[in-house]
Amino acid sequence: MATTTTVDDAQPPTLQNILDQKSLKWIFCGGKGGVGKTTTSCSLAIQLAKVRESVLLISTDPAHNLSDAFGQKFGREAVKVNGFSNLSAMEIDPTSSMQEMIEQSEQRGGALAPFMQDLAFAIPGVDEAMGFAEIMKLVKSMEYSVVVFDTAPTGHTLRFLSFPSVLEKALTKFSSFGKSLGPMFQQFQSMMGGGANAQEDMFAKLEGMRQVITEVNSQFKDETKTTFVCVCIAEFLSLYETERLIQELTQYGIDTHAIVCNQLLYPPPGSQCEHCRVRKAMQDKYVHEMMDLYAEDFNVVKIPLLTEEVRGPEKLSSLSEYLMHPYQPPQ
């Protein structure tokens, strides 16, 4: 029989410990689609900017909602967020880097580029994995004190976190293949009149990315450097996805000890709204389940459903306070 977690047993319902843990370098926010991942990651980045020297917020979700959230256009270059001196943001497509690298090789005279493309994309997930490597290489060169990732919906998030091991294996084979057939490539390249070093450069770049991935992989599995914030709403499917996410993160060896539950209803006392009453009863059921499952080991943060859309730095800053100071429902 499941035991009920008491208030005394429960972890503090805030993300204060993430702000206090100055050794953290990588923070991921993820969960099912439509649960408020972007709002949560933006809010957390705003709070981190109060205690860290420099914060970078990255969207790896193809939908790219950071621009909408802040009301400011972001792209592939890190740009300061309006109103903040030490918070930057960028939106990148993890699938674009491999194709760009092949195109660069072709432009430099790589007659074997079509062959290289077929070979590269024959490795499952390598296009996204190469994008991931490019992202991490870029981010590491920027030297921000902490990086917050606004990830894609759960399935994409888990694949994103598996890229280091996928890419490490793939690039080991790819580099080995390149070294074995390198002389043949050069001879054929000379016959075709192309640049002799194009493929060598490509292999060198792949090898460099493999080294970056190996280092990042070890950092992701270091709880002093990396943590994952699970974002959900009080519904069955979202709770189910959260449990699956936590289990898979545990399998990857990635620390997770925080859950943010968004869009909670708190009708004012005496409210005659039948829809609100029924909806709140359903939410309460899943919140109780969540607390029983996680409150002893996780910081479970409850965020209210607001009456207006959260867009722009001011509203995000206001919402971010709920991550540090528990919301007090009307009595």
Curated annotation (Swiss-Prot):
Disulfide bonds: none annotated. Transmembrane segments: none annotated. Keywords: ATP-binding, Cytoplasm, Endoplasmic reticulum, Hydrolase, Metal-binding, Nucleotide-binding, Transport, Zinc. It is an enzyme of class 3 (hydrolase). HAMAP family: Asna1_Get3. Homodimer. This is ATPase GET3.
